[in-house]
Amino acid sequence: MHQASFSDLAYANKKKTTRKEKFLGEMEEILPWKRLLKPLLKKYPKPGNGRCPIAAEVMLRIYFLQQWYGLSDPGMEDSLYDIESMRRFAGVDIDHIPDETTILNFRHFLEAHQLTEKLFRITEQYLSERDLILSEGTIVDATIISAPSSTKNQEKRRDPEMKQTKKGNTWHFGMKAHIGSDTRGRVHSVVVTDASVHDSQVMADCLHGEEQAVYGDKAYANEEEKHKAKSQGIDWRVNRKAKRGKKLNCADRSFNKKSNRVRARVEHVFGIIKHLWGYRKVRYRGLAKNAAQVFTLFALANLYMVRRELASAPG
């Protein structure tokens, strides 16, 4: 049996609950742990003649901590030694903290079996069952995730799977996360491409097919897609684009203003991922590894956005 250390006793007797403790307590309560673990346990190494693997739930909890706090594998190991609230969330004591290689290997395990996309699908279904993701309308949008553009690295070159794109007057190098969300900003579809792929090229992949309305900025303005949507009875609420040499008329400006009231709701999820959790730059080389992280981030962001509804729900 684990004997309580001095730090354990001091932690138990402290008076103030920190923001970190409050956040981790909320996420502990609302994450559907059994559902999330089910696909992992089918693939996770079983105890055998060799060293017994650390429990999948412990490793998944540590992986989530990395997403929320933007921690590298060595940084995660150090934080588990330093921060009691993280150890408690992970379910480990100070004598059984996994090292950075174990943390790295778990991430590779998730990537190898495409499990983070499954985690995203599980959370999306979980919220849909509770009417916390709606199917009536979809907002499409994309955000750029920067990658290092310098060649001052071990390979002496930039990541060949990342590309550049121009936004306004500024060039960006990296990848894009394209999403489809419901009209409250909860994400149901995620597609990751290099940054050079135009938003409209993956629009269809960001729809679930049961929409009654589609919202998007002028990057998605496409007459062919518009006619296709209208022929299916879908309300096309994509922002209208001024023709070359002409300004939008009053009716078009009014249309865009009304659509923007709904479309703006998708910015909340980007704000959570980029500003609250600090995911502005890719952490790994290659699209596949970074896409795996993106699926996880949007799954967790969906749950975070509806944490109060989940916490107050019966059962």
Model-derived features: where do they sit?
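Short helix-capping/linker segments at secondary-structure and domain boundaries
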Residues: 68-75, 278-282, 302-315
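Helix-centered, glycine/charged polyanion-binding patches within enzymatic domains
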Residues: 3-10, 208, 212-213, 218-292
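Conserved, non-catalytic sequence blocks in retroelement Pol enzymes and Pol-derived host proteins
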Residues: 51-53, 94, 288-289
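An N-terminal domain-cap segment
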Residues: 37-58
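Alpha-helical support elements that line or immediately flank enzyme active sites
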Residues: 58-70
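Polybasic low-complexity intrinsically disordered regions
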Residues: 2, 7, 55-56, 74, ...
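Charged, often Cys/His-bearing segments associated with DNA-binding zinc-finger transcription factors
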Residues: 1-34, 38, 42, 312-315
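N-terminal core-binding DNA-recognition domain of tyrosine recombinases/integrases
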Residues: 47-51, 70-72, 110-111
